[in-house]
Regions:
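Bacterial N-terminal signal peptides
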Residues: 8-21
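A detector of low-complexity, intrinsically disordered, Ser/Thr/Gly/Pro/Ala-rich segments
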Residues: 2-3, 19, 27
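Beta-strand-centric surfaces of beta-sandwich/beta-rich domains
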Residues: 25-201
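Bacterial N-terminal signal peptides that target proteins for export
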Residues: 1-9
Length: 201
């Protein structure tokens, strides 16, 4: 019995020392670890609806029904890593299903992303609610602010377009588009694609 107890204690000590080391080594490629890495040739950039006068009108002027606006037209090479928007008026006064977001990569004339803005940010059924996931979130105050953290690489430019397909004005459209600017994309980088499929099931 004493031998079994001693062996169990020894095994516990070995495992206790071994697994944290293995976990730490395997965890050295996660995003929090990457924050400490020094990166050369990479710049953090942001395009936003900020008021250029320094005032508090940090939104685009009203969109008329049927109007399209380009909110980001980025030249060169990079990776979009964050998009945030909030829109007035909120649902149900203005349906997020009637506001379309399109994204174009590398000078293409066809969109790689085309979706109503609500479903793109994870808000279905023309509803608004708070939630959080790794790539998408909505909040506070019943999901008024919408965030996307998907990585969206591009080599020869990126363009993001918003279209108002509703029968009323978008009174205010606030946004950030954050991206990394670089001379060359890392190897094996694909392109982000998303489309909206509305089928009754």
């Amino acid at each position: 019995m004493k031998r079994i107890t001693k062996f169990s204690l020894l095994l516990s000590l070995v495992l206790g020392l071994y697994f944290p080391t293995v976990f730490a080594q395997s965890n050295m490629t996660n995003e929090m670890f990457d924050l400490a890495k020094l990166k050369s040739g990479v710049k953090n950039k942001r395009i936003s609806s900020t008021d250029p006068t320094g005032g508090n009108r940090d939104h685009l002027e009203p969109f008329k029904p049927g109007e399209k606006r380009i909110i980001a037209d980025i030249k060169g090479t990079g990776v979009i890593n964050h998009i945030w928007v909030t829109i007035a008026p909120p649902p149900p006064t203005l349906s997020r299903n009637d506001i379309i977001i399109r994204m174009y990569w590398d000078g293409n004339d066809y969109p790689s992303v085309e979706s109503p803005i609500g479903p793109f940010f994870g808000q279905g059924w023309d509803e608004r609610y708070n939630y959080a996931s790794l790539p998408l979130s909505a909040g506070p105050e019943n999901g008024t602010g919408l965030s996307c953290y998907f990585a969206m690489p591009f080599e020869k430019g990126a363009r993001i377009e918003i279209e108002n397909q509703s029968d009323r004005n978008i009174d205010a459209f606030y946004f950030y588009v954050d991206y990394l600017e670089m001379a060359k994309l890392p190897k094996d980088m694909g392109r982000f694609h998303a489309w909206y499929n509305h089928n009754l099931t």
